[in-house]
Structures are given as structure tokens and as C-alpha cells.
């Protein structure tokens, strides 16, 4: 088997750094979970884009007469939350679907609930916190309408992010409970060390992939279009 080379994030060649993670949905994730895993990845991308747009909104806020603190904090949130959200909640759910690990699911639930709370706070928009939320944006319309309109864009995006985060958390939790997962299973994995054993993880991944492939390749009973009658010679 060829050695997997880290490919994420895809950095330009002139940057003297190498990717930190290996990510391949089709190779790592069982087919029945690829769609949900990709949706969570797109949600992480939306969160990153929203933080970048928020930086622009805070710049407009600064130009319109707002304080420089918001712009500085917005820049800090962008460079801090973008990699942290990937490591803290996307990688655990990626690993959870890859290896069917209850411990990874629990790690995702814990960190993603924090992500949901942060998204709600960002959508609310407390002035001085470096986010263009509803309170900050609406209150700034009386100061500079042009800047407030620009601030309205990340405000809407933060709101959408909060709604999508709640939906995603509900979907993953429903799937996890429906598949028989529980907190006791996560505790068992922690106690036995199965969550960090690469051989156990590979075995779980192979079992999940094999089950999915077997379900897709299961032969279907075929029926002949021509009826076959059996006649008895006894009258």
C-alpha cells in the first residue's frame, strides 16, 4: 500500500511549509458517509469565509468612525478560529466517520457545541468584540449608513452559519444515536486506548468499508418474465 502523503492545506510551493493533514473523502470515508462529511467540510469553509468577510466589515466599521479594537479582534478571530475550527471539530468528525469511533464523535459534539455558541454570539454582535453582528450593525446605521450596509453582509452570514451549525449538529447526533453510539462506548474506547490505536482504527475502517461495499454488491433476486408451470400427470 502506497504511503499517504499529507495534502491539506494545499499550500503554494513558494511557502516553506508542508501540509499537516491527509484528506481524501473517497479513499478514507465509507461511501454512505461521504456526503455528510463533505457537507461538514463545506460548513467549515463557510465559517472561514464568514470570518474573512467579517474582517472587511470591521474595516468598514473603522473607516465609518468605529474603533480600531474591532478590526484588530476581527483579524485575530480570522487567524485563530480558521485553523482551530478545522483541528478541533472537523478533524474529529472526519476521523469519526472514517473509523467509526465513538470517542471521536464525542470530541466532535463537545467542540461543535462550542462552535454553535460562538456562532450565535457572533450573530448577536456585541460591540467591541470584533464581530459585525445585529446589535453592532443596527446601532451603527445612525452613524454611517454606508459602513452599516457593508457590516450587514457578515451579520447575515454569521446568522446563516449559526442556523446551519444547529442543523448539522442535529443531523450528526441523530445519525450517531441511530447507529447505536453512546457515551459509554466512548468511555470504553478511552479506557482501552482504542481511540489512538492505529491498528484498531484501520480494522474499523476496513470493516465499515467492507460493509458498505457488501451492501452495494448484494445480489438481487431476479425473476423470469415467463411463468413456469409444473403439471402433474395424475388426474
Curated annotation (Swiss-Prot):
GO molecular function (one): protein-containing complex binding
Q: Does the keyword Transferase apply?
A: no
- Which residues face the membrane's Cytoplasmic side? 1-39, 89-102, 170-235
* Source species, domain of life: Eukaryota
Keywords, comma-separated and alphabetical:
Cell membrane, Cytoplasmic vesicle, Endosome, Exocytosis, Golgi apparatus, Membrane, Protein transport, Synapse, Transmembrane, Transmembrane helix, Transport
Triggers of expression: By endoplasmic reticulum stress.
* Transmembrane spans: 40-60, 68-88, 103-125, 149-169
Q: In its UniProt record, which GO terms are filed under biological process?
A: exocytosis; negative regulation of endocytosis; positive regulation of calcium ion-dependent exocytosis; positive regulation of cytokine production; protein transport; response to endoplasmic reticulum stress
Location within or outside the cell: Cell membrane; Golgi apparatus membrane; Golgi apparatus, trans-Golgi network membrane; Recycling endosome membrane
What family is reported? Belongs to the SCAMP family. SCAMP5 subfamily.
Q: What is this protein called?
A: Secretory carrier-associated membrane protein 5
Q: What organism is the protein native to?
A: Homo sapiens (Human)
Amino acid at each position: 500500500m502506497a504511503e499517504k502523503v499529507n495534502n491539506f492545506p494545499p499550500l503554494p510551493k513558494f511557502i516553506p511549509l508542508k501540509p499537516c493533514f491527509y484528506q481524501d473523502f473517497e479513499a478514507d470515508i465509507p461511501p454512505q458517509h461521504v456526503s455528510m462529511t463533505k457537507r461538514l467540510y463545506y460548513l467549515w469553509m463557510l465559517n472561514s469565509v464568514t470570518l474573512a468577510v467579517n474582517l472587511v466589515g470591521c474595516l468598514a466599521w473603522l473607516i465609518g468612525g468605529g474603533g480600531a479594537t474591532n478590526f484588530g479582534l476581527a483579524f485575530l478571530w480570522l487567524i485563530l478560529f480558521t485553523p482551530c475550527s478545522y483541528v478541533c471539530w472537523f478533524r474529529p468528525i472526519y476521523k469519526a466517520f472514517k473509523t467509526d469511533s465513538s470517542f471521536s464523535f464525542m470530541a466532535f459534539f463537545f467542540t461543535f457545541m462550542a462552535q454553535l455558541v460562538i456562532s450565535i454570539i457572533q450573530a448577536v454582535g456585541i460591540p467591541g468584540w470584533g464581530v459585525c453582528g445585529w446589535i453592532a450593525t443596527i446601532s451603527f446605521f445612525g452613524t454611517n449608513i454606508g459602513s452599516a450596509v457593508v457590516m450587514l453582509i457578515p451579520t447575515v452570514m454569521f446568522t446563516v452559519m449559526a442556523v446551519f451549525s444547529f442543523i448539522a449538529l442535529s443531523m450528526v447526533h441523530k445519525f450517531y444515536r441511530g447507529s447505536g453510539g453512546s457515551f459509554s462506548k466512548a468511555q470504553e474506547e478511552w479506557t482501552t486506548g482504542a481511540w489512538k490505536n492505529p491498528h484498531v482504527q484501520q480494522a474499523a475502517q476496513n470493516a465499515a468499508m467492507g460493509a458498505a461495499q457488501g451492501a452495494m454488491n448484494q445480489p438481487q433476486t431476479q425473476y423470469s418474465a415467463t411463468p413456469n408451470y409444473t403439471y402433474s400427470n395424475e388426474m
